[in-house]
Amino acid sequence: AYFDWTNIGGLPVYASAGRRPSTGGAPLNFREDEPRGGTPLGSRINYQFDGITLGWHIREESTLRFCYGIGYESEWGNGSELKRPADRLDDASFYGLNWDVWDTDDMFIQATVARAKDVTDGFNGLVVIPVDPLTGQDAPAPAVLRFDPSVQVGDIDLASAVLIRHDGPFDWFISGNYMESDPTNETGVFGGLFTDPFDKPQSQDGHMYYAGIRYNVPNEKTKIGLEFNHGSKYWFNFALAEDDFLGAKTSVRGDVWEAYVTHRIRDRFVAKLDYINYQFDYSGSGWLLGAPKKLDNNPTLGFPTYDEASKWMLSISARF
């Protein structure tokens, strides 16, 4: 749930509070043949959280927004209530500026900077640990355990930009994304911020670039697309809303190729045939704890890790 307050004081400004529209942002909507869903770039944040937004409509084609949200609530409704107040973690918060620089029918340019502050070493819930993350051997305890975050591992800064164009029968985009970590000296059972357990955390940076093109068949229902993205050794984004069983492709530390065909059966009913090939260069894609390991060296890893994977998928989606 959320509410909006528009034209505050007769000015082109607005405020919004509640569940943030933070999933399915551009350019992820290309591959689904859907309108832009979330406000932030989907290549950087595809993640549900609650918070507030203050927006300013600079002009008809341009909007600037300040966003704040809570990514982890340390108080009510979790295991932290059983701890002494001095031992409880701070809330993990998101701050960000999102600027729709230019938004018209033919072109969309967006830039975003954000900080995730007081990031924890996990989440409240069940975790599956089939092997010991320190030794790589079979875990001596049950594989499914209850887990609560134990330390705050630091802050993560992100910046990204996207250019989207619609030229005749073709739609295309290019996106650049950057990440830098500011760790504390804390490490938990899974390690620190991009650091193995018992090692001293150091600041790291990573990047990801992402490009795609889509052809609109003259029947105005069928679209054929090709996308590529590459993530560096320490690349990390917040993409937990992705429902792909191999994980978010935008989180991969390596190369991803995707080819797809969508066909709009009705206005809100889309069929899709999709092929994705993943080439993982480093371990830990989509995970902020532990140091990435080069996968061509047969490293000792605490979790099963792909070095290459591919999938075919036929899906039908209905939007209400």
Predicted regions and their residues:
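Loop-rich catalytic cores of soluble enzymes, especially ATP-dependent carboxylate-amine ligases
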Residues: 44-45, 73, 80-100, 114-121
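Outer-membrane beta-barrel signature, preferentially recognizing the C-terminal barrel domain
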Residues: 46-51, 93-94, 98-100, 247-262
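Extended catalytic-interface subdomain
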Residues: 68, 111-113, 124-126
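Generic preference for hydrophobic/aromatic residues in regular secondary structure cores
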Residues: 47, 111, 191-195
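Outer-membrane beta-barrel pore domains
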Residues: 122-320
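Alpha-helix capping and helix-loop boundary segments enriched in small/acidic/polar residues
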Residues: 39-45, 83-87, 150-151, 201, ...
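Outer membrane beta-barrel
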Residues: 1-76, 96, 100-108, 206-240
